[in-house]
Regions:
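SF2 helicase catalytic motif II
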Residues: 238-275
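Conserved interdomain hinge at the start of the Helicase C-terminal
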Residues: 362-380, 417-441
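Charged, low-complexity
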Residues: 2-148, 202, 217-222, 227-228, ...
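Conserved SF1/SF2 helicase motif Ia
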Residues: 145-149, 153-156, 161-192, 270
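Inter-lobe coupling linker of SF2 helicases/translocases
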Residues: 224-225, 229, 235-239, 298-406, ...
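Conserved RecA-like ASCE P-loop NTPase motor core of nucleic-acid helicases/translocases
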Residues: 177-184, 195, 355, 438-445
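Conserved helicase motor "Helicase C" RecA-like lobe of SF1/SF2 P-loop NTPases
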Residues: 443-467
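Conserved helix-turn-beta segment of the N-terminal RecA-like "Helicase ATP-binding" lobe
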Residues: 186-210
Length: 470
């Protein structure tokens, strides 16, 4: 296993920022547990204590006694943000933040994408205003040892914002630390190309194929790993002092009991950032899973979140509970849509983005066999015949690249896993549909449109086929 980065010191995290204790005072002197019990058990409104009559409300005191005497950092911050804490009986007790807790509460409330981060040195891109606000929001959270969910719509540039974040932190931290990006296989190559394009001086390491070594890891390096490899390398990855761990397409960790979620939770870091266009697809528990990874403890345990938030909101539609949840999560989740007033004016009319995907094993085998056979025939021909054979070969290779089933005319054959291009298309379209986007897919071949329609149907994506047979 690789050693931790030399000189690496963790930043201050949520657990050490705040240590909440509460006390009940009488003439400025704290009451002990025996005196508090006496006040809570009082049958009348007056209690003889310390040589004097003390007026009390037994019900209020009983509720106070149900509140834990000490709250850890996440629970205390949640109480400060929401303005209340829930006791063991489910009743709420008002909380008024003061001192540093109030300062932190106000500061977090100001993080919601208001400040713009200057483009860092080494970034070969011009960030749009909303992207600079996103970088500033992530950087402020990371500097405080916190984490968050960047939930921008697909196409708003979450990747370049993370690259800029890495550069900002590398130049603002007393000691630089590497960044780990965990992502689906289909976008691993895209991450590498985007980093090379927008931050050419940043060293990049892909933990794929046979070369998965972490030896000689640089403090300013970005490491890319798929979710599958991350699961297998979790112990080694946990040995590194990561500055930031980023989970791209973070819906992959929405099930806290799944192996992938357990593995990524075992990798410590100064800060964690989740990237997703759909923070909640079906249930509020998905939001809990994301924020419990980025900011552990903020929303309590899974059972606490279910009883205090999910059930009241999803089953009973309690507005006050929904508002309280919004207060808790707002500083830690930045959600921007393409139609937002602060985003739409900054967007170009169209952005062209190429996604390069690998061929499947079947496609590679068919490519090799077809090229070998065709070249033998082409070399033995000449003139117009030779030209025609070259064009037929190119057409066949295009069909194989689309899907082997198209070339073999297997209209009803299996689809999944046979074509890198089809699998990537389904993933991109699925992400867009989950973000309530509309998608137009073109193909030169009617037969390929039929295969796409079948594959979308398997994924539950409704579509209209506008292909007209020639």
């Amino acid at each position: 296993a690789p050693p931790p980065v030399a000189g690496k010191e963790p930043m201050v995290g949520l657990g050490t920022l705040l240590d909440f204790r509460w006390e009940v005072l009488c003439d400025g002197v704290p009451l002990d547990d025996i005196e508090l019990d006496a006040l809570a058990d009082a049958k009348r409104g007056l209690v003889w204590m310390r040589g004097r009559w003390v007026r009390t409300d037994a019900e209020v005191m009983r509720r106070i006694r149900q509140v834990p005497s000490g709250l850890d950092g996440p629970s205390g911050l949640a109480a400060a943000l929401a303005g209340e804490v829930v006791d063991d009986d489910g009743a709420t007790v008002e909380v008024v933040a003061a001192g540093f807790a109030d300062t932190l509460r106000l500061r977090l409330g100001e993080l919601a994408g208001l400040r713009e981060e200057a483009e860092p040195e080494g970034l070969a891109a011009t960030l749009r205003p909303y992207q600079r606000r996103g970088v500033a929001w992530m950087a402020d959270l990371c500097r405080a040892g916190l984490g968050g969910v960047l939930a921008d719509d697909m196409g708003l540039g979450k990747t370049v914002q993370v690259i800029a974040l890495h550069l900002v932190l590398a130049r603002s931290r007393p000691i630089a630390a590497p960044t780990l990006v965990v992502c689906p296989t289909s976008v691993l190559g895209n991450w590498a190309r985007e980093i090379a394009r927008f931050a050419p001086d940043v060293p990049v390491r892909k933990l794929s194929g046979p070369d998965r070594s972490l030896a000689g890891l640089a403090s300013d390096e970005i490491v890319l790993v798929t979710y599958g490899v991350m699961r297998r390398m979790a112990d080694d990855l946990a040995e590194v002092g990561w500055g930031v761990v980023v989970a791209d397409e973070a819906q992959s960790i929405k099930n806290p009991r799944a192996r992938t979620s357990r593995a990524i939770r075992s990798i410590p870091a100064d800060a964690r950032i989740a990237l997703t266009g759909t923070p909640v697809e079906n249930r509020l528990s998905e939001l809990w899973a994301l924020l419990d990874w980025t900011t552990p403890g903020l929303l309590g345990s899974a059972e606490h979140f279910r009883t205090q938030f999910a059930v009241p909101i999803e089953r009973r539609g309690v507005r006050t509970t929904s508002q309280r949840l919004s207060l808790l999560t707002k500083p830690f989740m930045l959600r921007r849509r393409k139609t937002d007033d602060g985003v739409a004016p900054d967007l170009p009319s169209r952005t062209q983005h190429d996604v390069v995907v690998p061929l499947s094993v079947e496609q590679l085998s068919m490519y090799e066999a077809l090229v070998r056979e065709s070249l033998f025939q082409i070399n033995g021909s000449e003139g117009a015949t030779r030209v025609g054979m070259v064009f037929r070969l190119l057409t066949a290779l295009k069909q194989i690249a689309n899907h082997p089933g198209q070339y073999l005319h297997e209209i009803d054959g299996p689809l999944d896993g046979r074509s890198g291009k089809l699998d990537a298309t389904v993933e991109l379209v699925g992400a867009a549909v989950e973000g309530e986007e509309r998608v137009l897919v073109f193909s030169q071949y009617v037969e390929m449109c039929h295969l796409l329609r079948r594959r979308f149907a398997e994924e539950g994506v409704s579509c209209s086929d506008l292909a007209v047979p020639a």
